[in-house]
């Protein structure tokens, strides 16, 4: 049998920018949410590739390198390791995790550009830009600081004022200075390549009309607001100090690089090609052939996860670039957009030291990753901004994991081990059992529907509902004093179901629970059913433990 390489779904997480380590908002905003959905799809017997990678070009990397007296590549290589360490701790199960500084990505971006350029969709324009005579470079927005013309804030950045929030061109700043040497720059002319998005407005509108039914509401609204206005041409090339970007393969533009958002979105296709090439075992699909063709991308469904600040680049920029190639690349089918996660009612800030960042957790001194995966799913900012609160965190872990799910599963398994010699043997179901099965099956199917629609919080709540119904059923059995052993054996099937349903959210805990049940991880079945015969494992112990006082103190006293 030939090995299958084509997949139905390519699930992507917006590429994390590698100038710094991710905080909790970054993690739930795209990477963790995409991981949960990918795990669900795999259990739902769908053909899936989940990929992402670090976004490593642009001025922010250059500035971080300058501040630390390192090269941009050093910054990327060091932080790439940090990112991967954090994602590994969170049990993010990528099928492929790449980086945009790879030679494969450079080639893919340049090939993509050549298609668009050959089709006549780039135009050359001469623009004026700040030029620092002392540094001998054109100054990108991040290399300029000055006084805001709107509010007179004296430390306004080159593209947006932190004082009043206005956006503007860097040339609009008063008394602009170079951030590298603090001298006053001159204004010089430079030629760049522009891409006119308005050429594709009709196609973008058609894409929106066709696929936005599968998009989260915030993604729809943000995209609609752009489509309701004229889409202006945007500069797709840059003059950067270290030429830190994908080089432009065009005569007279050899010293320029592509705008970081031009190359970043193409990264999804690069990483998929790298994924296929790495797994190819046939001469027909060797690495060179994979990168010479785009046929492997046909008939794939693109499902994309991101924060709301990245929507424009994925629903306007990315599809427009695809349209401009005149090739059959997959267009965004499903879109899941998160709002912002606050930390104790304020924005995360590395510079102000406010918030929990990935490296704060990887030593497990504030609990295992399953606790953090669960809580971040619980507060996932799906429809509006949500808030991380230490008090809420500890309350949720105790109420949901210990008192609800943990207590129910432990009660059932301990009874079967101690009172029934670890055995499940059921001949027929009672009327009460049939009613319970109907109730559980209804909630189970709601879980599947919610997760399929990427309503992740809603899916999580369905597990709690199932556990609650299980608790009530067991209590009814005990109170009735009728067929009590049989009742606990019936309840065992609910425990197994919970173990399967938890896997996308907290895979390590799911594995532990299924091991105690002596069951394997399985794909989702069509309906909930009662397991008539089974034998549970020997080592039955609480799935979760109460947060001890010292851990609660460490969490509540954490100051960033």
Curated annotation (Swiss-Prot):
Segments carrying motif 'KMSKS' region: 347-351
Superkingdom field: Eukaryota
Entry GO terms, CC: aminoacyl-tRNA synthetase multienzyme complex; cytosol
One term of GO molecular function: methionine-tRNA ligase activity
Subcellular localization: Cytoplasm
Cysteine disulfide links: none
UniProt keyword annotation of Cell inner membrane present: no
EC numbers on record: 6.1.1.10
Motif 'HIGH' region: where in chain: 16-26
Pfam family name, one: Anticodon_3
Family: Belongs to the class-I aminoacyl-tRNA synthetase family.
Record-linked PANTHER family: METHIONINE--TRNA LIGASE (PTHR45765), METHIONINE--TRNA LIGASE, CYTOPLASMIC (PTHR45765:SF1)
Protein name: Probable methionine--tRNA ligase, cytoplasmic
């Amino acid at each position: 049998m030939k090995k299958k390489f084509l997949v139905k779904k390519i699930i992507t997480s917006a590429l994390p920018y590698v100038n710094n380590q991710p905080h909790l908002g970054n993690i739930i905003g795209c990477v963790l949410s995409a991981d949960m959905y990918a795990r669900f799809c795999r259990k739902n017997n769908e053909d899936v590739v989940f990929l992402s990678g670090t976004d490593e070009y642009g001025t922010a990397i250059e500035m971080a390198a300058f501040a630390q007296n390192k090269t941009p590549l050093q910054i990327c290589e060091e932080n790439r390791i940090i990112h991967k360490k954090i994602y590994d701790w969170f049990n993010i199960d990528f099928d492929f995790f790449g980086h945009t500084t790879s030679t494969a990505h450079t080639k893919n971006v340049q090939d993509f550009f050549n298609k668009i350029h050959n089709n006549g969709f780039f135009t050359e324009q001469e623009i004026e830009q700040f030029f620092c005579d002392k540094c001998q470079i054109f100054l990108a927005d991040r290399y300029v600081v000055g006084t805001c013309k709107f509010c007179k804030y004296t430390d306004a950045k080159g593209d947006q004022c932190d004082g009043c929030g206005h956006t503007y061109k860097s040339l609009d700043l008063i008394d602009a200075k170079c951030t590298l040497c603090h001298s006053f720059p001159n204004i010089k002319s430079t030629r760049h390549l522009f891409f006119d998005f308005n050429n594709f407005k009709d196609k973008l509108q058609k894409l929106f009309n066709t696929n936005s039914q599968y998009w989260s509401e915030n993604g729809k609204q943000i995209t609609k607001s752009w489509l309701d206005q004229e889409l202006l041409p945007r500069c797709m090339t840059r003059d950067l100090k270290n030429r830190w970007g994908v080089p432009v393969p065009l005569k007279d533009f050899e010293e320029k690089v592509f705008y970081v958002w031009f190359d970043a979105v193409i990264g999804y296709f690069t990483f998929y090609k790298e994924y296929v090439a790495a797994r190819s075992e046939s001469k027909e699909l060797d690495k060179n052939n994979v990168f010479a063709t785009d046929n492997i991308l046909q008939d794939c469904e693109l499902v994309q996860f991101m924060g709301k600040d990245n929507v424009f680049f994925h629903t306007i920029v990315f599809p427009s670039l695809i349209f401009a190639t005149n090739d059959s690349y997959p267009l965004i089918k499903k879109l899941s957009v998160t709002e912002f996660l606050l930390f104790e009612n304020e924005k995360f800030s590395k510079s102000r030291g406010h918030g929990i960042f990935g490296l704060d957790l990887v030593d497990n001194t504030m609990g295992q990753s399953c606790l953090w995966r669960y809580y971040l799913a619980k507060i996932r900012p799906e429809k509006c901004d949500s808030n991380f609160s230490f008090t809420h965190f500890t309350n949720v872990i105790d109420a949901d994991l210990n008192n609800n799910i943990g207590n129910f599963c432990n009660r059932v398994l301990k009874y079967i081990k101690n009172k029934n010699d670890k055995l499940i043997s059921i001949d027929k179901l009672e009327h009460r059992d049939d009613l319970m099965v109907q109730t559980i099956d209804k909630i189970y199917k709601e879980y599947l529907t919610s997760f399929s629609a990427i309503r992740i919080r809603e899916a999580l709540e369905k597990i709690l509902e199932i556990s609650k119904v299980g608790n009530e059923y067991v209590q009814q059995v005990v109170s009735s004093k009728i067929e009590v052993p049989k009742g606990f054996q019936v309840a065992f099937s609910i425990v197994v179901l919970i173990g399967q349903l938890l896997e996308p959210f907290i895979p390590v805990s799911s594995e532990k629970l299924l091991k105690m049940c002596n069951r394997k991880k399985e794909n989702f079945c069509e309906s909930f059913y009662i397991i008539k015969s089974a034998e549970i494992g020997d080592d039955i112990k609480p799935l979760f433990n109460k947060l001890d006082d010292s851990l609660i103190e460490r969490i509540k006293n954490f100051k960033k």
